[in-house]
Structures are given as C-alpha cells and as structure tokens.
Amino acid sequence: MALAVLRLALLLLAVTFAGPLFRRFSKYKTPFCARYQLPGCPRDFNPVCGTDMITYPNECTLCMKIRESGQNIKILRRGPC
C-alpha cells in the first residue's frame, strides 16, 4: 500500500513539473520584427518555418511577408518546413 502511495506521489510530482515545460515548447514563437529595418533584409541563410507552412530564408523575410500581407504568421520552428 505504501509503495502505491509513493508511486502516485512521484507521478503527481512529475506531471506538475513537466506540464509547464510542454506548454512552453508547444507554443509558436512570435518573430521579433522590430529589430529589422524593413524593407530590405540581410542575405544570411537561417531558415525558419512559418505557421503558414512556408520556409522563409530568415526571420526578416518572414517579417516582410507579415508586413505585406497583414497575416499573423508565427515561427513554427527554426529550419525548413
């Protein structure tokens, strides 16, 4: 009986501390467009995958697309889609 209570307590602790980690990593990242002076982006290749499932060469080009289209595109992940 004591072993079952101990297992339950450990499970509750694990869920309590792991929950915020999963929520933090499951959210999409908002691009920080204020750092770029648009129009005109650097030519560095650091691809990002937008929530519109388009791969952008870098975060600046994603910001340019947001500015032109008015869409609320977030960064799904770093790297190609």
Swiss-Prot record:
Ranges of residues in domain Kazal-like: 27-81
GO terms (BP aspect): acrosome assembly; spermatid development
Main localisation: secreted
Pfam annotation, one family: Kazal_1
Any single Gene Ontology cellular-component annotation: acrosomal vesicle
Record localization: Secreted; Cytoplasmic vesicle, Secretory vesicle, Acrosome
Cysteine-cysteine disulfides: C33-C63, C41-C60, C49-C81
Matching PANTHER family: SERINE PROTEASE INHIBITOR KAZAL-TYPE 2, SERINE PROTEASE INHIBITOR KAZAL-TYPE 2, SPINK2
Name of the protein this chain belongs to: Serine protease inhibitor Kazal-type 2
